Regions:
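Conserved N-terminal entry element of GNAT/NAT acetyltransferase domains
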Residues: 1-30
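A short beta-loop-alpha structural element at the N-terminal edge
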Residues: 23-37, 46-48
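Conserved GNAT-fold acetyl-CoA-binding loop/helix
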Residues: 40-66
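Conserved beta-strand in the GNAT
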Residues: 80, 86-95, 109, 114
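Conserved acetyl-CoA pyrophosphate-binding loop and the N-cap/start of the following alpha-helix
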Residues: 119, 123-131
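Conserved active-site alpha-helix within GNAT-family acetyltransferase domains
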Residues: 126, 138, 150-168
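Conserved GNAT acetyl-CoA-binding A-motif
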Residues: 136-147
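Conserved beta-strand-loop-alpha-helix junction that forms the acyl-donor binding cleft
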Residues: 145-155, 172-176
């Protein structure tokens, strides 16, 4: 497993917190219903967040079309974590273009990360993250980025433990 070293890079070592029956694999079109279920659960769980609380009534139908397109896209992957064959987590990773005037020109962008409550603190996030980082490295990407809700202290601590650091804040101003 990968852990942040003191220099901010990732180092490999075993992680005894991972459940023995936990596996991570790239989702396929056959997994679309599970992907929809997990990713909508993420949005519903954060219904107090100013961005995520605005879930559209037709979100499941929109999700089906959107996530199917994402599953077919060669520049991204959706990973599923399964414990004894039951889906317990999801993570999407995209090979994303960087800013045109800055390095790196491409980076991995991690999003839509969700672990079912009963599977939390059992290494699911770390296993999903490890798969995403391996996928990024296979594509020559040397940096990973993500956004997460500022008020989610548990997620902030988890991402910090995986080597991420805050470099900017997303601000929202309602115009109506």
């Amino acid at each position: 497993m990968e852990h942040p070293a003191s220099d901010g890079h990732m180092s490999l070592e075993a992680d005894s917190r991972l459940d023995a029956g936990l596996t991570v694999r790239a989702a396929t079109m056959a997994d679309l219903a599970v992907v929809i279920e997990l990713r909508l659960a993420l949005l519903r769980e954060h219904s107090e967040n100013p961005i995520y609380r605005r879930l559209r009534p037709d979100a499941p139908a929109r999700a089906s079309r959107l996530f199917a397109a994402q599953l077919r896209c060669s520049s991204e992957v959706i990973f599923l974590a399964e414990s004894d064959g039951v889906a317990v987590g999801v993570l999407r990773c995209v090979a994303s273009a960087g800013l045109p005037l800055l390095f790196p020109s491409r980076h991995g962008y991690i999003s839509s990360v969700y672990v079912v409550p009963s599977a939390r603190r059992h290494g699911v996030l770390r296993a999903l993250f490890t798969s995403a980082i391996a996928w990024c490295r296979e594509r020559g990407l040397r940096e990973a980025r993500l956004h997460n809700a500022v008020e989610n202290e548990t997620a902030n601590a988890a991402w910090d433990a995986l080597g991420f650091r805050v470099v900017e804040h997303l601000r929202v101003c309602r115009l109506s």
